[in-house]
Amino acid sequence: MSAVFIPYREVFMNYAGIKEYDIANGPGIRFSLFVSGCTHHCRGCFNPDTWSFHYGKPFTKETEDYIIRQLGQDCYQGMTLLGGEPMEPVNQKGLLPLVKRFKETYPEKDLWCFSGYLFDKEILGHFAKIMPETMELLKYIDILVDGEFVLAKKDITLLFKGSSNQRTIDVQKSLHAGELLSLIHISEPTRLDVI
């Protein structure tokens, strides 16, 4: 009798890399996961290798277990998802088990996500209507930095974003209110003020 292969996930997702003890992609010390695959192809992208969905390594149960284990360290304020594009449909499906497990295991830690897709127009206005995973994933994301990187609007003085068109959104307050109204002003790398 031959062995039956049972995949870890129904959807295959690659990741480009992991950055531990990251201080550039959200407040405090972060555990950052760079997923592979992005269809935006922004001019001036800092990570063009991640555009390919085949770049990097397969995201496995062992990868997920490692991330969850590492995030148990007290030094981490939270986890950040970026890439690549975490909100690409295949990546949403691949990330959902990880973020659910992360928030169930560490409810006191925050989850940031960077996406070139606009929260109100593309994520809620399109993906949420055709993919049940979108609303489920948003349930666990605390802060979303949205909008494509625009080279002509590049601003190195901005905290946690690359161009002035990008927005920092409190996802949970926005979902609760039913509209985008909870933008966050970042006054210091470790302090967030809701405005």
Which sequence ranges carry the predicted segments?
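An anion/phosphate-binding loop that grips the pyrophosphate of nucleotide cofactors and donors
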Residues: 141
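Conserved Radical SAM active-site core
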Residues: 11-15, 29, 47-127, 132, ...
